[in-house]
Amino acid sequence: MRHNKSGRRLGRNSSHRAAMMRNMVTSLLEHEKITTTDARAKELRKVVDRMITLGKRGDLHARRQAIKVIQDRKVVGKLFELIAPRYTDRPGGYTRIIKLGNRLGDNAPQVIIELVEEEFTPRVRKAADDKAVAESVATEVAEATEAAADTKQAE
């Protein structure tokens, strides 16, 4: 039984899987967009989000941890100087997965995984918004009960 065993095996042994993830993380951070299969992209998203969070920390220990995963020192520099500062206000969710369709050879679902570009604006709910929503729901309920009462009286 596979109870409490998270992560996909992707048809590879552990060392091959780790090497593939390191290669894909390096490519994604270098090019900021890659095409791959759906399962690989979902696993890659976890590692890339962790690397960008390390980049946001920005200290020497975080840089050394990133070097363990990212295989190119230039890409590590790009992560810490260019990519991570774009996401200082964003609390996670640095990547986007866009479905493309299935691959011709083996019908595997293909996706594009890319770094999110637009600015993050945190949603702030105001008391006025909550009050307006509550009032609109109350008026809809009142109208529905009136309509039900009118139809009952018409009968």
Swiss-Prot record:
Keyword list, A-Z: Ribonucleoprotein, Ribosomal protein
Pfam families recorded: Ribosomal_L17
Entry-linked InterPro entries: Ribosomal_bL17, Ribosomal_bL17_CS, Ribosomal_bL17_sf
GO molecular function: structural constituent of ribosome
Alphabetical GO biological process terms: translation
Assembly and interaction partners: Part of the 50S ribosomal subunit. Contacts protein L32.
The protein's name: Large ribosomal subunit protein bL17
